[in-house]
Amino acid sequence: MSVTLEKLQEMWEKDSKIDRDNLHEESLNIPSLHAKYFELYNTIFLLRKKAEQQRKNIRHERYEYFSGKADPDVYIENPFPKKIRDKDTMQKYLDADEKLSNTSLKIDYYDTMLAYIESILKVIQNRTFQIKNAIEFMRFNSGLG
């Protein structure tokens, strides 16, 4: 299940609406909504873990490359005339490396999605109270409360 942040926002825009005429059904729908978004959370959490491992692997690969310790065949395809030994210089090269940056951006994207889903799950957990308050307000307006 691959979902983008935009798709996630569209899904929540639709799912967040509470039908005032069917509060009983909305109440019964809470567990399935929670399951839906918790499944998404777990999937994205695992994708983030995978991306973290990829970043570690790429960082090691690029460190070897920039320090001149990579397999000689690598330099035939992609020559690098320097051998970086200084820690600060190495960090600058790693920070500027496109492969490493792309993986870091992917992790940041997953973090944004996870934070968004966490906020959705909090709203879903409070939905029972929202529905209860809506029912009490309807009773009050009809003179029953």
Predicted features and spans:
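Charge-rich amphipathic alpha-helical interaction elements
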Residues: 1-145
